[in-house]
């Protein structure tokens, strides 16, 4: 906080190699799992505005350093879990590319973009559906087949790719805002990559009796979370 205001563009350091260097200390504390907040390339310091699901943010490290951390942690009995933000991206992303910072044609830049149908535009390009109305977080269409392929395709999809890179699973941001069908496919993709993979969801209310967006959620049946 500076002057009582939240500074989402202030960065304070901390890297994957720094965590790896502290593994003996963490082991001595009795820690057996490290849950990382989002580490993918993003504009903000919190990184819940994903810019590229395939790349670790350079401020945190590299994809190779993530795998090295997971391998080193596993040797001392510690697992590493990633945070998945799959309900929305950042406006400053490969996929939306509001500011043209990425070489790809983003959905905001042209209707011929391969990512155009990932989003919902009411009046193109300025009026689009955003997570809780926050325009910096354009909401994804979770039912879009190409988006699902990007997420779940064996080996190459985001979900299995990062498990195969070393993550023990996923903690899902706003899981109760993800459709049940999407969650089932996500869990199946994770388990196909690693039968022991963990899929943990952020659900604010009683998960055994949860109704979200007019639908009773089946979190306790074992096929979503």
Feature-to-residue mapping (PLM):
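Active-site-proximal helices and loops of the catalytic beta/alpha 8
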Residues: 67-78, 87-88, 93-104, 158-160, ...
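Alpha-helical packing segments of well-folded alpha/beta enzyme cores
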Residues: 15, 19-22, 65, 69, ...
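Extracellular/periplasmic catalytic domains that process cell-envelope and extracellular macromolecules
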Residues: 27-29, 74, 109, 163-164, ...
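Short amphipathic alpha-helical segments
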Residues: 49-54, 136-138, 168-170
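Active-site-adjacent "subsite" loops/lids of carbohydrate-active enzymes
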Residues: 94-156, 160-165, 175
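N-terminal structural segment of carbohydrate-active enzymes
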Residues: 1-82, 87-89, 94-98, 149
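Active-site oxyanion-binding pockets that recognize sulfate/phosphate
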Residues: 9, 141, 169-172
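Aromatic- and acidic-residue-enriched segments that line the glycan-binding/catalytic groove
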Residues: 45-57, 86-129, 212-224
């Amino acid at each position: 906080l500076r002057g009582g205001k939240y500074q989402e563009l202030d960065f304070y350091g901390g890297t994957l190699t720094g965590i790896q260097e502290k593994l003996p200390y963490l082991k001595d504390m009795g820690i057996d799992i490290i849950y990382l907040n989002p580490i993918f390339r993003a504009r903000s310091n919190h990184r819940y505005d994903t810019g590229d699901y395939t790349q670790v943010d350079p401020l945190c490290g590299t994809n190779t350093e993530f795998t090295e951390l997971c391998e080193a942690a596993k040797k001392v009995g510690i697992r590493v879990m990633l945070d998945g933000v799959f309900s929305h991206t950042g406006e400053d992303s490969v996929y939306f590319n509001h500011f043209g910072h990425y070489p790809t044609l983003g959905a905001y830049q042209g209707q011929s973009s391969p990512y155009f149908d990932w989003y919902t535009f009411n009046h193109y390009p300025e009026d689009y559906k955003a997570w809780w109305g926050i325009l910096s977080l354009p909401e994804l269409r979770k039912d879009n087949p190409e988006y699902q392929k990007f997420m779940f395709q064996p080996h190459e999809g985001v979900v299995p790719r990062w498990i195969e890179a070393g993550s023990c699973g996923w903690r899902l941001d706003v899981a109760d805002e993800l459709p049940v069908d999407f969650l089932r496919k996500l869990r199946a993709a994770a388990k196909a990559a690693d039968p022991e993979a963990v899929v943990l969801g952020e659900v604010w209310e009683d998960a055994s009796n949860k109704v979200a967006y007019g639908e009773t959620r089946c979190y306790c049946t074992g096929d979503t979370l």
